[in-house]
Swiss-Prot record:
One Pfam family per UniProt: LUD_dom
TM region positions: none
Source organism (scientific name): Escherichia coli (strain K12)
Protein name: Uncharacterized protein YkgG
Similarity-based family: Belongs to the LutC/YkgG family.
InterPro entries cross-referenced by the UniProt entry: FTHF_cligase-like_sf, LUD_dom, NagB/RpiA_transferase-like
Anything else known: The E.coli ykgEFG operon is a clear homolog of the B.subtilis lutABC operon, however it is not able of restoring L-lactate utilization to the B.subtilis mutant for lutABC operon. Thus, ykgEFG operon may contribute to lactate catabolism in E.coli, but under conditions other than those tested, or alternatively, the ykgEFG operon may be responsible for the catabolism of a metabolite other than (but perhaps related to) lactate in E.coli.
Top-level taxonomy: Bacteria, Pseudomonadati, Pseudomonadota, Gammaproteobacteria, Enterobacterales
One cellular component (GO) term of this entry: cytosol
Gene Ontology MF terms: L-lactate dehydrogenase activity
Length: 231
């Protein structure tokens, strides 16, 4: 017996079992929670659970609206939060909902323009409210998912004091596993991946110091979800 065999034999004896030279199949997992948790919920139940978690745990304000009333709801919320300075993502989906145009009319909002370069960041830094379109909501965490692009800068949801996220009810997913699957499908289809994928769960929240909870140390002080009931 060579040194390797002798060593392995000693290990096997210490474990109280015969020497194994071939790998053993792993036991079947007891569950598949990583992929299946919350998938039993229908879309309405997902939305209800999403709102409850976001409101109770993340201290995020949630409102429901229709496509037809989305623009007026966005105006009202921006005015409540502080319409003296509003920046909007250059996302065409906000334009299609009429939100971009109405906020420019009513709140003198500025639209993120890639051609302006660093000026966009300065405007976002001085803004009271940033308005962005969320790709998905995650029921488990109460967070929203943002895909960055030239017309959708990361500063829009980071620098303003308040963030208003426009989210469609139909895009609320059970958890991050389903988000990963959608990204995988995009990659398999040859679609270009976003430069940055942000999962935002409302304002920052920490209780590191003496277990005293402090909200809004970084990121938006307050987040608002405007959920469009499209299903």
């Amino acid at each position: 017996m060579d040194n390797r065999g002798e060593f392995l034999n000693n290990v096997a004896q210490a474990l109280g079992r015969p020497l194994r030279l071939e790998p053993q199949a792993e036991d079947a997992p007891l569950n598949n929670y990583a992929n299946e948790r919350l998938t039993q919920l229908n879309q309405q139940q997902r939305c209800d659970a999403f709102i409850q978690f976001a409101s109770d745990v993340m201290l995020t304000r949630c409102e429901l609206t229709s496509e037809a009333k989305a623009a007026e709801a966005a105006i009202r919320l921006c005015k409540e939060l502080g319409d003296q300075s509003v920046v909007i993502s250059g996302d065409t989906r906000l334009e299609e909902l009429g939100i971009s145009e109405r906020l420019q009319q009513e709140c003198n909002a500025v639209v993120w323009d890639p051609a302006k370069g660093a000026e966009n960041i300065s405007q976002a830094e001085q803004a009271k409210v940033g308005v962005v379109y969320a790709e998905y909501g995650l029921t488990e965490s109460g967070g929203v998912v943002l895909f960055s692009a030239a017309e959708r800068g990361r500063s829009l949801s980071l620098l303003p004091e308040y963030s208003l996220f426009i989210l469609r009810k139909s895009t609320i997913l059970p958890r991050v596993a389903q988000l990963a699957e959608k990204l995988h499908q995009k990659a398999q289809a040859g679609e270009r991946m976003p430069s940055c994928i942000n999962i935002i769960s409302g304002p920052s929240s920490t209780a590191d110091i003496e277990l005293i909870k402090v909200v809004g140390v970084h990121g938006p002080v307050k987040a608002v979800y405007l959920i469009i009931e499209d299903c």
